[in-house]
Structure formats: C-alpha cells, structure tokens
C-alpha cells in the first residue's frame, strides 16, 4: 500500500484526495489545510487533517476541526506527498520534502525544472519511474499531450499550431477574471508550447492563448501537419485506443461546453467531473496532410488520473497496470459517447 499525503486541498488537491482514496493500492495518510474554512470542515469527515505548522493547530481547534498533526508529521507517515499548493509554492516546499527524504508530485503551475521530469501518463510515464520528484503538467498541456500522443505515434507530427481559449477561473473562485472581456496572452508562443515539449518529442510547436469569461472548460482549436498520410477514419481509430479521449458530436446537442458539462454531471461521477478530453467528431478534418480538430477540457479534473498514475510511477508500478487501475476506479471509458458509430 502506497501511503500518500496531500499538501493543499483546493481544486486539484481535493480531487486527488478522493481519487487516491478509492484506489486499492493507495492509502491517503491525510491532507494539509491552511485555513479552517468550510472545506476543511468537510474534508475532516473523510480525511485526517494536518496543518502547515504548530501555530495553526489552535486556530483549527477553535473552529471545531480536529487536527492530527503538522506537515512534518504527515511526511513521516507518507511515502509520497502530492503538492497541490498554490502556484509557485512548490519551489519552497521541495526543500522541505528533500530534507525529510519524501517523494513528491507537483502540479503544472510550477516550473518544469522543479523535479526529475514532467509527467503525462500516455506519453512519458516511464521518465518518472522510481524517481523522487515529478511534475504533472498543466490541465491544458495534459489535454494536448493526451490527444496528440496517438497522432504522433501513428503518423508523426511535422508542425503544430494550437489556439487555446482558456476559462477565466474555476467556478468557486471569486477573485479572478476577466468578467466582461477576452484577454489575449501577449507572449508568442504562449508557455504551453514549451510545456508540451517536456512530455512529447515535438519540435515545431506554436500556441496562442486567450482567456474568456467562462468557468466551465477550456477549448482548443488544433492544426497538425502530419508526417504521414492519414484519413479521418484512421485518426478516429487512433484515438479510440485510449480511454481518456471521448468523441462527441454536435448533432447530439453538444453545441457548447455547457452541454458537455451537463452530460458530465449526468454521469454522476465525483463532483460531476469529466476526466476525458472531449473531441467534437464533427470538427475533425484532414486536408492533404493537415489535421484539424476542436477539443474541450475540464480544467478541474483532467489532471486527476495523471496524478494517480504519477504516484504509481514514482513507486515503480507498471504503466499499463496503473492506467488500467486508475481508469477502472474513476469509471473512465472514453470512446464514442453513445458507444456506437
């Protein structure tokens, strides 16, 4: 049994904690919360609560939340820490983990040089195999790697152009925006290009990113110059080999991200999450050697299977065994939405 502690219980941390808790080979030692808020209270129903340091214990107990110990205590009872703290804190936290000689997994908001490797389950699982520290790439990069890996494997990629329409913030965040604007990234390519190269062997990658006033999902418009010829049916066949890709169609009333997330809620998974990357089949076109498609990304959850697989990769568990266990436990099945042509 792999003992795992979760440092940070926000959008990603709480989902990793749940996903880890339903694995038959992972035990959640506890979670670290910094503030004794409603989320800490709810978490205490399912997990041992730890705090960053001794100074926080009384604050939590004054709010009626029992504290098991501090981060130091959690590290002593864990084989691996999943660091889901706010962006940028990982560089400080890794010093603590190294001092305690505990393995750690970081999130995509950290710089790529924070660990021994960056991680995507499909494309480079073994680069983190039995390592000490790895970083699960961001929600956008995870989505791109997941749908491009089959294409790269089967047909090769000469050139890649991606326009990323990013959600402004997550549904529970009242601090960020924009609210009534579209905000373009002024860097070209956006940081997603270099991030993608940390998990896929690609050279010519060009990305443009824009923030839109929505909280539901990201949307990517993708153009791939293939090395080898392929037909649309060939591309579909490649994607259908991978459970974490879901093929949907506009004619089934998937007109927008609103309907996709409505479908996800109806699946009755934890928190109404959609772990798979949804590709509109209607959008897939091949002209000469250029492949075009549009995909939607549930930014709150697509990296969760990756975090579970990263735990097993650091622990020396086989790639295919891990992916199969993760998919089965989270009810990830992918394929064509209605299960037939």
Curated annotation (Swiss-Prot):
Q: Which reaction does it catalyse?
A: D-glyceraldehyde 3-phosphate + phosphate + NADP(+) = (2R)-3-phospho-glyceroyl phosphate + NADPH + H(+); D-glyceraldehyde 3-phosphate + phosphate + NAD(+) = (2R)-3-phospho-glyceroyl phosphate + NADH + H(+)
Q: Which InterPro entries match?
A: DapB_N, GlycerAld/Erythrose_P_DH, GlycerAld_3-P_DH_AS, GlycerAld_3-P_DH_cat, GlycerAld_3-P_DH_NAD(P)-bd, Glyceraldehyde-3-P_DH_2_arc, NAD(P)-bd_dom_sf
Q: Name one GO cellular component term.
A: cytoplasm
Q: Which family does it belong to?
A: Belongs to the glyceraldehyde-3-phosphate dehydrogenase family.
The organism's taxonomy opens as: Archaea, Methanobacteriati, Thermoplasmatota, Thermoplasmata, Thermoplasmatales
User: Where does it reside?
Assistant: Cytoplasm
Residues binding D-glyceraldehyde 3-phosphate, per UniProt = 138-140, 169, 192-193
Instruction: List each coiled-coil range.
Output: none
| Superkingdom as given in the UniProt entry | Archaea
In its UniProt record, a GO molecular function of this protein is:
glyceraldehyde-3-phosphate dehydrogenase (NAD+) (phosphorylating) activity
**Which CDD domains does the record associate with it?**
GAPDH_II_C, GAPDH_II_N
GO BP terms, alphabetized: glycolytic process; lysine biosynthetic process via diaminopimelate
Active-site residues annotated for this sequence: 139 (nucleophile)
Q: Which Gene3D superfamilies match?
A: Dihydrodipicolinate Reductase, domain 2 (3.30.360.10), NAD(P)-binding Rossmann-like Domain (3.40.50.720)
Q: Which gene holds the coding sequence for this protein? A: gap
Keywords associated with the record: Cytoplasm, Glycolysis, NAD, NADP, Oxidoreductase
Major place of localization? cytoplasm
Q: What does the entry list as the binding residues for NAD(+)? A: 11-12, 109, 167, 299
EC code(s) of this entry: 1.2.1.59
Show the SUPFAM superfamilies listed in the entry: Glyceraldehyde-3-phosphate dehydrogenase-like, C-terminal domain, NAD(P)-binding Rossmann-fold domains
Q: What is this protein called?
A: Glyceraldehyde-3-phosphate dehydrogenase
- Subunit structure, per the record? Homotetramer.
